Amino acid sequence: MDDKRFWDRYSKNYSALMRRSERMYLQIHKAIRPFLKRDMDVLELACGTGQLSVPLSPYVRTWEATDFSPEMVTQAKKQLHTSRLHFSVQDATKLPYGPESFDAVVISNALHIMPQPEKALSEAWRVLKPGGFLFAPTFVWGNGRWAGFRLWVMGLSGFHVYHRWTAGKLMAYLSERKYAILHHQLLGSKYAPL
């Protein structure tokens, strides 16, 4: 099964599954919120069903939430949202937006499951205004004895993890792609450290 079919298949249950990590998402909201300003235009890549888009979009001028799964976007559009929020199906590695279009790019819980995250990061860099922010909460490889087993079980359903970064290796990976790390924080979740 390819990745898009996997996410389309799980889109109806994704929000319920992510509720198990509600505390983690609240921590992500709390970390991102102070950087958001009313005059900002934000692009979100891999928005899923709107776990970040819906609660954070009221704090900015516009929030363009995208995902490559049409079914995820369909589910996201069912969420309560504001006129500032727009959902669309987009490929994070081939964005239709012009250079320097956004004040911030959010790519949450997705870099590790992208076959070529460097392409998405390059596109994010291209569409970011000078001095813009990238918010990239990402599951990292932990030391827990159950981490490998969980991934194996998830893999049986078609879920692919292409990159198993530690927190340090993820920061190095981002730095190698021009991003300056202003803040990092390790959060816990039901699945893996973030």
Please state what every model-predicted region is:
Residues 162-177:
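Short alpha-helix
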Residues 147-166:
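Conserved Class I S-adenosyl-L-methionine
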Residues 43-45, 49-94:
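Class I SAM-dependent methyltransferase SAM/SAH-binding core
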Residues 93-104:
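A short acidic, Gly/Pro-enriched loop at the edge of an enzyme's catalytic core
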Residues 118-130:
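A short glycine-rich, Lys/Arg-flanked "PGG" loop and its adjoining helix->strand segment in the class I
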Residues 1-37, 51, 75, 142, ...:
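Conserved class I S-adenosyl-L-methionine
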Residues 104-116:
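A short SAM/SAH-binding and catalytic strip from SAM-dependent methyltransferases
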Residues 136-138:
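Acidic carboxylate diad motif detector
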